[in-house]
Amino acid sequence: MPQKNAQDRLWKILTPVLLVLAVLAMAKTLFVGLEIDEEYAFSLGFRLVKGDRLFYTMWEPHQLSALPAALVLALYTAIAGTTTGALLFVRAVVLVCKAAMSAVFYRDFKQTIGRHGALLSAVVLFVYTPKWFLGPDYISQQFHFTVAAFLCFYHYYTHGFRRPWLVVLGAVCVCFSFLAFPQSALAAAVIFIGMVLLGRRGKEPTICKIPRGAVLFVLGCMACAAAFLAYVLPGMGLTVFLQRVSLILNDPQYDFTTSQRLALLASQALNTAKFLAKPLAASVVLCLLWWAKTRQKRDWIGLALNLWAILAALLCVVRAVADSSSDERYFMPALVLAAAWAFRKGRGTVREPLFWLGFLPGMAAYAFILRSTLLGFSATFMYLTWPALCGCFAMLARRQMEPEQEKLPQGQCVLAALLVFLLVCRFWCVLVTGWKPANVATANLKQITAGPAAGTWADEKAANMQMALYEALEPFAGKQVLQAIGEQHGLGFMMAGGTLTIGQASVISGTDSDPRFIQYYEELPEKRPDVILYDEAEVRDMAAFHAWIEENFTITARYPVTHGTAHLQVLVVD
């Protein structure tokens, strides 16, 4: 009892401290930093707001993630009548949604994993975003809609199969997750199997001898698919739709085979293994010394795995500070292995729904994402965060249900190490264009005073570019714009108060001259631009596309726009 009272007193102090730190960290993220991936998410949504159509006039590889961003941007433009300041608004909406999700998590899990564990977990969920920014890009949507779907399913299966509408709502959320990253749709099969097993073991009411939740899940997904096709197909037809899908799937950036992808991953895995070997060795040595001293009978493998994850996470904290990089997630494989171990002997316990509805679908999604993404091996670890967190919840649940077997708060310690990593990266690192290392001490931050990013602070290069885009495009209200630039500036399309339209096949960054750019204007002549932008500091090979532009468009005027380090060239088209 005295020990419990001491823990309660400690948590009375820790609770407000954690909440204040989390709020301050996310407030910094709300106002500071800008990266082109976040801009890309905004420009996708803006295309829908301005009347572009999925697959028909949008040839984007990630266009299926455009719907949520479009809804929020449409709301803002309807209220404000402009896109000025839209970045802050959308970030704030995402932040409010994250806070609500964390609150729901705490409410539903405080009995299962304890109040303190639920609080720590909720704070981690609030502070975490896959790419650190708050903009609703496709990776962030895949994570957050997955969590939202899980919360719906988990409540239904752990509260006596009441409120079946939650399964339908969860199906809608999971469909948005699949739209954001279609390769993760394999998780649907795992979720269905889990629902059938959980339903039969829990004596759930059935429909046609199939557990009700599984049936509602399938019907909900089918309804979403039908609604999506009803939205996309009118005016285009199935034949054109399939042609567009084939065209987009043949994106030159993704032109690699499974064997080529596996070979690349294998070559990169060695560096991760070298990094993880040190904390693993330290964990094994510490556990052996502990065992030699106490000779206790306990789960030494689980303890070693958890200690490995903790040490690896703390080592990543040191690297993040030293390198000023928030991309130090090498600890995640260790955390996933510790998570997998936490689910052993979980059948019939409160851990079972966590396994079937959270951990296993997350691992299935990761397997297919790993094959299809362009990211390097260590960068893909962000997709392991959700299954890893489910394992942490399982550790907390086991200790809550079996306090005599699990006296050490291992789950809390693992989550605490993860939270330290997240908070250090949030406070110390600054997002800059190109994911280059930067921190609050060295980044030359400037306030952006005009355009959709008005009111935020970014590194000097990004801030200057936003102001140059504003100055270059302000005279062209209502015109159609083409950025013939390899590194696209998505917020540039939202200049001139949101009156511009987008006149190009794709707004994704990182592409060299692509023959589909030319095909786009041949098939859709109405998308020919009125104004074209070049970047004098072009980092991609756009020579072929620029040559085609000069030959096929009548350029009536050409002039430079410079703002600090940003140098644009404006071409006016007849």
Positions of PLM-derived features:
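Short hydrophobic/aromatic helix or loop-helix immediately within or flanking a transmembrane segment
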Residues: 42-48, 57-82, 177
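Short acidic/glycine- and proline-prone juxtamembrane loop motifs at membrane-interface regions
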Residues: 134-143
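Short hydrophobic alpha-helices at membrane interfaces in multi-pass membrane enzymes
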Residues: 152-176, 207-219, 304-306, 354-360
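Membrane-interface alpha helices of multi-pass inner-membrane proteins
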Residues: 130, 165-182, 188-193, 223, ...
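Perimembrane helix-loop-helix junctions
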Residues: 158, 187-225, 258-259, 289-295
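Transmembrane-helix signature of polytopic, membrane-embedded enzymes
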Residues: 100-127
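Short periplasmic/luminal acceptor-recognition loop of GT-C membrane glycosyltransferases, typified by
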Residues: 60, 188, 427-509, 530-540, ...
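Membrane-interface transmembrane helices that cradle and orient dolichyl/undecaprenyl
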Residues: 111-115, 147-167, 340-351
